[in-house]
From Swiss-Prot:
Cellular compartments annotated: Nucleus
Family the entry assigns: Belongs to the EMX homeobox family.
Organism: Rattus norvegicus
PROSITE patterns: HOMEOBOX_1 (PS00027), HOMEOBOX_2 (PS50071)
PANTHER family per UniProt: HOMEOBOX PROTEIN EMX-RELATED, VENTRAL ANTERIOR HOMEOBOX 2
Location of region: Disordered: 1-74, 212-241
GO cellular component, one term: nucleus
InterPro entries xrefs: EMX-VAX-Noto_Homeobox_TFs, HD, HD_metazoa, Homeobox_CS, Homeodomain-like_sf, HTH_motif
A GO biological-process term: retina development in camera-type eye
DNA-binding region residue numbers: 102-161
The protein, known as: Ventral anterior homeobox 2
Main function: Transcription factor that may function in dorsoventral specification of the forebrain. Regulates the expression of Wnt signaling antagonists including the expression of a truncated TCF7L2 isoform that cannot bind CTNNB1 and acts therefore as a potent dominant-negative Wnt antagonist. Plays a crucial role in eye development and, in particular, in the specification of the ventral optic vesicle. May be a regulator of axial polarization in the retina.
Record keywords: Developmental protein, DNA-binding, Homeobox, Nucleus, Transcription, Transcription regulation, Wnt signaling pathway
Amino acid sequence: MGDGGAERDRGPKRREEPGGRSGCRGEHRGAEDLRADTGSTSPREIAGTSASSPAGSRESGGDSDGQQALGETDHCRRILVRDAKGTIREIVLPKGLDLDRPKRTRTSFTAEQLYRLEMEFQRCQYVVGRERTELARQLNLSETQVKVWFQNRRTKQKKDQSRDLEKRASSSAFEAFATSNVLRLLEQGRLLSVPRAPSLLALSPGLPGLTAGHRGTSLGDPRNSSQRLNPMPSASASSPLPPPLPAVCFSAAPLLDLPASYKLGSSAFEPYSRLEQQKVGSPGQSDKKADI
């Protein structure tokens, strides 16, 4: 009896063992099939699909639930990537063009609002606190819109001021350059227009007290000059000569009247002057001899 009961107890166990073994084999086969199916795909794509699909929320746990709670928009795609250190990072990529993404609408101000904002900016460039709240209420705008408008207006004013300073600096530099060029040209013109010494022919007709004979002596041969110089002592005795004129320049000095006692020291006029002196002195000597 005991042996029969023991055999009965062993029977179901033996029957269960093949079933249990078959169940384990089925699980191993399912894992192998899954590996074969996923062998062609990369682990990045598997992670991406698990993060983007709702079924992957069970594996990721509370983190994926929080991401789904934040809301995954239609224009973004999230991918989980494991780097070389083993940490998993999330990358957000756009699904389509950036133009498809919804953008913030720009605030369009009316002419009245712009006029009022400009007047307030001219009065005070920084509007804060109650003033900004009251201005936003009067213009039917939000405080953020008023704040952003004032920020943009201050930035524009700074740009305009810097541009004006650059223009003034460039204009002043140009004026200084032009002035230096004009001064340089004037200096060059003054140096080039230095008056030259007047020539002898230009000064000879304008000098008073010069006769044609004197001009002939200055320009003629020495013989004529010796004959023309003879009447000088008699003329000086009868009427006094006018005082000599000051020399205009060094080139006009030979044209002045020479006094009677002046003796020419040049070798060309010496023989003629000696002959004339002997002729003039001979009548006086004869008179002295007669008196004796």
